């Protein structure tokens, strides 16, 4: 048989029909076998009903996006055929439940193979329509040419806590589905994916990686309010709070969540909260207070489509302006974004370090595509990012204070960063409010002190880009035709587009931005100057990231945008077409 490097499998139907669980079983098994995976769920903002799909890209080498096209489409309804049939590549397969009497007429004369098979009827032979997804799993395994044993072992383990009868019926449903496809295919050969050999890897959500990263950073306190697409961070923390000795507070709203997390930070712990766009709006006043009080808190903002409730289950990168400017006054804070699901783990640890090193709020901004989808990544190194608590004082090192003097918590230092104490430290007493203050934290409205403290709060941020890698550098050309810059989940599609341009002899450099605020203009300028054109790739309608470039960079005329705001992730072709327009 011919060997391939990857394939894309997709299953669709109505929410609540077991589509996600079918995909999860397949993905979990293949991840254990060493395949590199990227999964994507598309679903409506409702509990049950409405069209949904689960797509899985399976590859021999690491993939950073869901890719384009579909090789194997498994459909439980006609809607899936109508909506996604055009994605199926030549030589690909569509299997649809014969119960819906599928219409394949638009595929006549094409090289797409269409099979109408009795998925529901086969499930009912085992006594329940709930087994349709297991029948579909068996069909998929037959199409993909995988060994059945590992899947059957997984099914047996999944239902082991139930009766042996349930286990046997699910195994029979799997065998029936497998047999139907094998009988239909006969001697037809399908390209298969060779076994890569087992790897030391994990398969997890970006949100789970964020939670794991927070734990690795030493955080044991979280206050949050559930919101799509960020809730999984809190759910993971709650699931593991007992073994961690952690405290998780589900508050009544996002304002309370932010203030509660600030309270934990004030008390000396590494506290954080997690939200999405609507919640970030509610946190604006609290974040401004955290900036004034120089409290090192972390806010995870998993970006979704807006404005308002928007499309809560669709991807967008439209919180950039809100993260940078939402808090009132001259707000001093840091905004960073991970470039991959793997970086959700490592960069969130750096977010906690930055917060304490610079004593300010840090907003950590993955997007929905990262937060709610899974990718296989090398097993995390818990020791890669050492904990840095900045100028945290030890009680033994504090000089004696003569009452009623307070500790100079907001001392006007050369680098703008003051020594920090926490409540309870002898000789470390200070005031902390949202009011402008003097060095001891006492309210002060003298013009000179306000200017001095404001300058101090911004002066300390001048070295952020020197102490943090502001972007992922994929720029290999000293002189480039185009520089492409993206953020968050766009990385995979951009890298695939750039790789094709390399093969075509077009010089395209690529940077994936991590540091959004303070904007790393100095570090970006050499790459900017070395390119004839600059294309900013972002998921919003107004070019929010592009505007940051135009505000901060020279030679603005060379900048253009590649915008996408339909709720779907970037693809290689979409990015490539945008680059071609400026060549």
Language-model segments: what does each one mean?
Residues 1-217, 221-223, 533:
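Active-site cofactor/cluster-binding pocket
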């Amino acid at each position: 048989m011919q060997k391939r490097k990857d394939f894309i499998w997709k299953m669709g139907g109505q929410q609540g029909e077991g589509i996600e669980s079918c995909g999860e079983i397949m993905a979990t098994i293949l991840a254990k076998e060493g395949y590199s995976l990227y999964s994507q769920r598309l679903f409506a903002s409702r509990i049950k009903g409405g069209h949904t799909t689960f797509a899985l890209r399976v590859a021999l080498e690491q993939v950073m996006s869901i890719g384009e096209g579909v090789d194997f489409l498994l459909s439980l309804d006609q809607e899936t055929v109508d909506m996604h049939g055009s994605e199926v590549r030549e030589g690909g397969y569509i299997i649809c439940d014969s119960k819906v009497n599928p219409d394949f007429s638009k595929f006549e004369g094409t090289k797409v193979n269409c099979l109408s098979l009795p998925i529901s009827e086969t499930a009912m032979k085992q006594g329940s329509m709930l087994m349709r997804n297991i029948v579909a799993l068996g069909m998929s395994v037959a199409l993909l040419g995988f060994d059945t044993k590992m899947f059957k072992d997984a099914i047996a383990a999944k239902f082991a806590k139930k009766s042996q009868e349930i286990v046997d019926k699910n195994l029979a449903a799997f065998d029936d589905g497998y047999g139907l496809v094998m009988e239909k295919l006969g001697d037809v050969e399908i390209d298969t994916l060779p076994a890569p050999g087992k790897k030391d890897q994990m398969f997890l959500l970006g949100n789970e990686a964020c939670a794991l990263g927070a734990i690795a950073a030493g955080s044991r306190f979280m206050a949050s309010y559930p919101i799509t697409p960020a809730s999984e961070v809190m759910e993971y923390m709650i699931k593991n709070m007992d073994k961690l000795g952690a405290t998780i507070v589900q508050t009544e709203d996002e304002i309370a969540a932010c203030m509660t997390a600030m309270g934990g930070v004030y008390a000396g712990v590494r506290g954080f909260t997690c939200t999405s766009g609507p919640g970030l709006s509610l946190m604006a006043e609290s974040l401004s207070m955290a900036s004034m009080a120089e409290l090192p808190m972390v806010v995870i903002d998993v970006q979704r489509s807006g404005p308002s409730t928007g499309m809560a289950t669709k991807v967008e990168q439209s919180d950039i302006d809100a993260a940078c400017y939402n808090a009132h006054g001259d707000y001093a804070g840091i905004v960073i974004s991970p470039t991959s699901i793997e970086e959700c783990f490592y960069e969130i640890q750096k977010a906690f370090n930055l917060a304490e090193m610079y004593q300010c709020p840090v907003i950590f901004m993955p997007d929905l595509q990262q937060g709610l989808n899974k990718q296989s990544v090398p097993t995390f190194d818990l020791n890669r990012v050492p904990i840095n608590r900045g100028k945290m004082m030890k009680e033994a090192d504090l000089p004696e204070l003569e009452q009623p003097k307070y500790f100079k918590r907001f001392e006007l230092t050369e680098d703008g960063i003051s020594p920090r104490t926490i409540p309870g430290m002898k000789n470390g007493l200070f005031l902390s409010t949202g009011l402008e203050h003097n060095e001891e934290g006492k309210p002060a409205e003298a013009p000179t002190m306000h200017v001095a403290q404001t300058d101090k709060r911004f002066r300390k941020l001048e070295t952020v880009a020197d102490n943090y890698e502001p972007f992922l550098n994929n720029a290999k050309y000293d002189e480039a035709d185009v520089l492409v810059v993206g953020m968050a989940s766009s990385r995979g599609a951009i890298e695939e587009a750039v790789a094709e341009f390399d093969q075509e002899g077009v010089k395209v450099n690529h940077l994936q931005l991590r540091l959004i605020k303070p904007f790393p203009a100095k570090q970006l300028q050499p790459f900017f100057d070395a390119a004839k054109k600059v294309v900013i790739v972002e998921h919003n309608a107004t070019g929010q990231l592009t505007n940051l470039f135009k505000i901060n960079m020279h030679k603005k005329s060379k900048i253009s945008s590649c915008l996408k705001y339909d709720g779907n992730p970037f693809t290689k072709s979409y990015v490539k077409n945008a680059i071609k327009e400026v060549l």
